[in-house]
């Protein structure tokens, strides 16, 4: 059978998803790590914080509910985020670490440290690390009643 006429193969152009920058220049994003004792969120935005680039939670990576906040789930979530950032051309991240805060605990959950380590190990450059846990100047009353939580 003879080849068809009029059908020419078009050259595919390579389209970069990320910003156009010089070689060796860092493109920064902001990584918001929210580590509670029930889950860990790894959320990357642009520098303004308005445009979400990628968001993965520990619960998206593991099946059991009890493992959502584990360091392993946080590590898997951070690796996913780092891979997606590299695809989009983001090479460096500023970290904003957050615990539950308010009138609850001000210490980050178990996934915070491992998420940060996984980001660094996966080749992302780390800019500034900041703790943005909400700390009240004078809080509302904590739950548990007058005599506290009885175990």
UniProtKB/Swiss-Prot annotation:
- One GO CC annotation: synapse
* Protein name according to UniProt: Small ribosomal subunit protein uS11
What Gene Ontology molecular function terms does this protein carry? mRNA 5'-UTR binding; RNA binding; structural constituent of ribosome; translation regulator activity
- Location in or out of the cell: Cytoplasm; Nucleus, Nucleolus
- Region feature (Disordered): 131-151
- Origin organism is Rattus norvegicus
Q: Where is this cross-link: Glycyl lysine isopeptide (Lys-Gly) (interchain with G-Cter in SUMO2)?
A: 61, 63, 106
Keywords (A to Z) from UniProt:
Cytoplasm, Isopeptide bond, Nucleus, Phosphoprotein, Ribonucleoprotein, Ribosomal protein, Ubl conjugation
